UniProtKB/Swiss-Prot annotation:
Subunit description: Homodimer.
CDD domains (UniProt xref): URO-D (cd00717)
Example GO biological process: protoporphyrinogen IX biosynthetic process from glutamate
EC number: 4.1.1.37
Organism: Aeromonas salmonicida (strain A449)
Keyword annotations of the record: Cytoplasm, Decarboxylase, Lyase, Porphyrin biosynthesis
Pfam families: URO-D
Cellular localisation: Cytoplasm
UniProt-recorded name of the protein: Uroporphyrinogen decarboxylase
Gene name of the record: hemE
Length: 355
């Protein structure tokens, strides 16, 4: 294995010394970049882009050519797992993801296969191997999956949702059906992430985008429990290094202590929580990733720098901070503003890391 030229991101996740705060952006390979749009046009559509290892590699590397980012993240989608289970993923123009065969009953859940990550999801592993090769040890590669709860919301609702009525109906009227679905999804995600690690991912992240729509008790029983199972089932050492695991529940700021108790290495934070408060609560147990509002990138460059400075000061001195947005970058952001953000993190953070 090539030694990493820049391991700042991995070191920060393990709360080890770094010379400056590492930074990457959720959805850093995406529609805000004109070069991404050009590559997607070549692919034809989103899933064709995901399924072509060379093109998925190209869009993964595009933001690294523009910005001095400290990590690359696999270009893929959280819905690859339910798609591999046979639900028939497709994308409606302007509507987002849909499933041809949503989950409606216990029989549907019982019939679901657990996908073989090197078979039905082999195209993802090919992308991981291709990206890892082309990175040439410059920065680490992040693999990822959706959380069981978040994947289940799409599978039961049949796509995106605002009210989550179908899955909440299942949760309250047929909890055993939902628990079986979540358990199968947890097993699928463990296999999927471990295959990504074996293929070359040096860190993994679980996106629990919709955990924040649950009551505290339901969050514990229907989301956190299954993320805990995933953390317990993951490969944590590979290529002579620890493989850090980050859990991110959007709107999950009230549950940081419980998430930190899963044994993960880092928590993702959205912008609705003060990072100083998060550090006070769980900074002795886990690293923190975040947490600038992605909409701040619409602001003037001076205002972006000011916000970066505020968040860095909130975390303060010491290790264990990976700077990121609190969610994905918006598609109509000026790429120059993203560059201001990345450069500001490096420039303004060195003072907090004494050498």
């Amino acid at each position: 294995m090539k030694e990493l030229k820049n391991d700042r991101y991995l070191r920060a996740l393990l709360r080890q010394d770094v010379d400056m705060t590492p930074v990457w952006m959720m959805r850093q390979a995406g529609r805000y970049l004109p070069e991404y749009k050009a590559t997607r046009a070549v692919a034809g559509d989103f899933m064709s882009l995901c399924r072509n290892a060379e093109l998925a590699c190209e869009v993964t590397l595009q933001p690294l050519r523009r910005y001095p980012l400290d990590a690359a993240i696999l270009f893929s989608d959280i819905l690859t797992v339910p798609d591999a289970m046979g639900l028939g993923l497709y994308f409606e123009q302007g509507e987002g993801p849909r499933f041809e065969r949503p989950i409606k009953s216990m029989a549907d859940v019982q019939a679901l296969p657990i996908p073989d990550p090197e078979d039905e999801l082999g195209y993802v592993m090919n992308a991981v191997r291709t990206i890892r090769r082309e990175l040439k040890g410059e920065v680490p590669l992040i693999g990822f999956s959706g959380s069981p709860w978040t994947l289940a919301t799409y599978m039961v609702e049949g796509g995106s949702s605002k009210a989550f009525t179908k899955i909440k109906q299942m949760m309250y009227a047929e909890p055993q059906t939902l628990h079986l679905l979540l358990d199968k999804l947890a097993d699928s995600v463990i296999g999927y992430l471990n295959a990504q690690i074996k293929a070359g991912a040096q860190s993994v992240m679980v996106f629990d985008t919709w955990g924040g729509v649950l009551t505290p008790r339901d969050y514990r029983d229907f989301s956190l429990q299954y993320m805990h199972k995933i953390v317990d089932g993951l490969i944590r050492e590979n290529e002579g290094r620890r493989v850090p695991v980050t859990l991110f529940t959007k709107n999950g700021g009230q549950w940081l202590e419980q998430i930190a108790a899963t044994g993960c290495d880092a928590l993702g934070l959205d912008w609705t929580i003060d990072i100083a408060d998060a550090k006070r609560r769980v900074g002795d147990k886990v690293a923190l990733q975040g947490n600038m509002d992605p909409s701040m990138l619409y602001a003037a460059p001076a205002r972006i720098r000011e916000e970066v400075a505020t968040i860095l000061a909130g975390f303060g001195s010491g290790n264990g901070h990976v700077f990121n947005l609190g969610h994905g970058i918006h598609q109509d952001v000026d790429p120059e503003h993203a560059g201001v953000f990345v450069n500001a993190v490096h420039e303004l953070s060195a003072q907090y890391h004494g050498r």
